[in-house]
């Protein structure tokens, strides 16, 4: 599983280094160094703006997700299903890190996520996300506002 946060940079050509522990998880837990980069679910900042980042799925996980979306396992209305396909499936790009662990983030996805020099890689279990550092600071603040206040529910999760 992907866990932890790593602060890294992206160069002028759009290349960034995937944290070594994430590369290791790709190979040891998912059996493949290939992965898919796509748009992450936007975070509503409650002020009319949204935080946009990227989600990275091991290839096998992505293929399973793609099957579920195509089969409409969420039973979404057609308009929502088509929006989901355009927002998640459409921009998805299969990638592989080079021998130095670097990956080229496709230009359209860099623009979408407003990626500047500093990036956060954030482990999310069976995927990881990539955020511009400024956006990630706002995402964290929003997450704190959204954090469940029900102590019994948190205790049941072991938190």
Curated annotation (Swiss-Prot):
Keywords: Cytoplasm, DNA-binding, Repeat, Transcription, Transcription regulation. GO terms for cellular component: cytoplasm; nucleoid. Forms oligomers. PANTHER family: TRANSCRIPTIONAL REGULATOR MRAZ. It holds the Pfam family MraZ. Its main location: cytoplasm. This is Transcriptional regulator MraZ. It is found in: Cytoplasm, Nucleoid. PROSITE patterns: SPOVT_ABRB.
């Amino acid at each position: 599983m992907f866990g932890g946060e790593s602060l890294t940079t992206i160069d002028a050509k759009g290349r960034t280094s995937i944290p070594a522990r994430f590369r290791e998880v790709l190979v040891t837990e998912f059996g493949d160094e290939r992965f898919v980069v796509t748009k992450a679910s936007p975070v509503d900042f409650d002020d009319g703006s949204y935080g946009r980042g990227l989600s990275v799925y091991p290839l096998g996980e992505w293929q399973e997700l793609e099957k579920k979306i195509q089969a409409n396992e969420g039973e979404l209305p057609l308009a929502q299903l088509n929006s989901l396909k355009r927002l998640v499936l459409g921009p998805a790009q299969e990638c592989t890190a080079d021998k130095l662990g670097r990956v080229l983030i496709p230009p359209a996805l860099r623009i979408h996520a407003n990626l500047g020099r500093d990036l956060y890689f954030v482990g999310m279990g069976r995927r990881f996300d990539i955020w511009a550092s400024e956006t990630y600071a706002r995402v964290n603040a929003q997450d704190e506002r959204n954090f469940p206040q029900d102590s019994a529910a948190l205790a049941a999760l072991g938190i």
